[in-house]
């Protein structure tokens, strides 16, 4: 619902992609303030229709491309879905770093052809997959062996990699020591952020918020990494 030309960045708030990657906004935090009623109002004004969409029309359309199919507010995030989507973001960071491709785009390459650049990324994925398989016998990002579609990267696989010291296998082949250290910290902090999600234990919300902001600041310090909508929401 919230994707497409000039789309919204997050389905829980009204901030844009640029704002979600801006220091001052990150420091202030992002309140969950997007309502179903707002989305319905946009649809009533027909801003979601294809013929009415315009480039950079974020303020009026806010990413809405279809009328909502629900009549209830849904402000919760499912833990498993969060794990899988955020792991995809982490995996992209890692294989870009291994390839030495310091750009979030996978279609723009400096000094080499697009074919060579894509091949470098594919080879970097293979390096990480091989490392994980040899060290802990886990198949990462392979076709689903059960034949049900999707990939072998299940929730259990993600937890095995993020919630243990196995997470360093993802960054083992990053040659830039400083970059490797930063990405190791990012993965560690993200894993800590996820730990309380399925827990009934009480946490210090203020400290938790500080950790989330610290993580976002660390990500922003690596200039070529971009927050995806999935990662921003989670």
Predicted segments, located by residue:
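A structural signal for the principal folded core domain
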Residues: 1-234
